[in-house]
Amino acid sequence: MINICIIATIVIYLVGMLLVGFVYSKSNEDSSDFYLGGRTMGPLVTAMSAEASDMSSWLLMGMPGLAYLTGIASPGWTAIGLAVGTWLNWLIVARRLRRYSANLDAITVPQFLSLRFHDQRNLLNALGAVIIIVFFIPYTASGFAACGKLFNSLFGVDYMAAMILSAVVIVGYTIMGGFRAVSTTDLIQSVVMSMALIAVLVYGVNVAGGWDVVLDNARSLPGYLTMAASHNAADNTATSYSLLDIASTLAWGLGYFGMPHILLRFMAIEDEMKLVLSRRIASVWVVIAMTASIVIGMVGLGMTKAGALEFLSGSSSETLIVRVASLIAQHGVLAAILAGLILAGILAATMSTADSQMLAAASSVSQNILQEFGHMKLTEKQSLFAARLTIICISVVGVVLARDPNSSVFGIVSFAWAGFGGSFGAVVLCSLFWKRCNLQGALAGMLSGGLMVFVWKYIISPLGGVFGIYELLPAFLMSLVVCVVVSLVTPAPSAEIEAEFDAAK
């Protein structure tokens, strides 16, 4: 009976997402509607869809698990970097990008860069699209894998079957409703994620014996409640959290300036003046959600201390919220429905990221590669068909990549984050705020940043020591330096480009 209630809750949730896609399926008249919702999104939807698509399953799985095992330092510094990055992205980039992209009639990030620099050969379009595809496909695969593992661990459902079902639902509402459906479902999913965090937190504190007991337990563990050390659960010791560690975790915030699926939200809002409200909503939600996520890890350890939960070692710590949901479900039908809602929250965290990534990748293939770089003349219907076909193809490849339930596909998430931040971040900032930046500089910056991610990750980082820093930071700096230097040693932009730059101020 308990499993039936949980499954019914999740099924109702998934069917609801498909209905949203169906409702918006008739509102996509052209590619601008499909990719950007016709630039008609309100401030609440813009804010919450951006943050829901940002906060993938790591918010409900990775971050609580990390806090559970190591204390508050690593997740805490990461959260600070992400919170500051979120706020700066909304404050600095959002309004300028909305105005500039609307002036140029750009509907994708690569297209914006191409039009910004009058790239007649569409090299920026092609390079940007390739980068998006290279990093988004495995990123999407990790989302499918999360869904498959969730159903498999809870109900014993075949991993592959569960993953395919999840992919079908995500692909279904995305290809039907496009950006409007994705943004609306992301808003709904952010609410579900919030409810899941609150329910787990309240229940966990109660089972652990109260907040004072949770804090006393955390204080008794070496290095657990300090931002200057990390707790080692294996031998109950503390390890110093170095400046290098802090720099690596804070560097996550730089990734926001280059995230295509987040930048698209800025481009889609109906009125740039409403971005102020969106920024406030997004920033507050991010801080509260990440704080709750870290505290859940601490509370989970308190539950283990109280004997309500077995000790979760290694990667099993990421199933903390799933384990708590299972405990909640034991308290009757209503509790089982609540547990189903919590598990739907994990699905929501995964789906809200995967749908946005697939839409961004589809726009890159249909708009940037086929039409602009490949010079294919497509009607609006043909363009939308190409985008929808691309989404299906990406999902198939993603399912194939994640077909092994023991695969390490989750490891690609931080690498993909670095890939986007290193490739696009500095170039987007230069294109928006530096008039002297030119096509050659943007191309060189994007290419060097993307390559540095691979070089640092696989060649330099294994050397250890100071070289063990997160690859996003050196890639971002390399891209910035190369973009500036190449722009300065090559011809200045034309008067027309400079006039367009001034018009977007």
Predicted features and spans:
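Membrane-embedded helix-loop-helix hairpins and adjacent transmembrane boundary segments
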Residues: 1-505
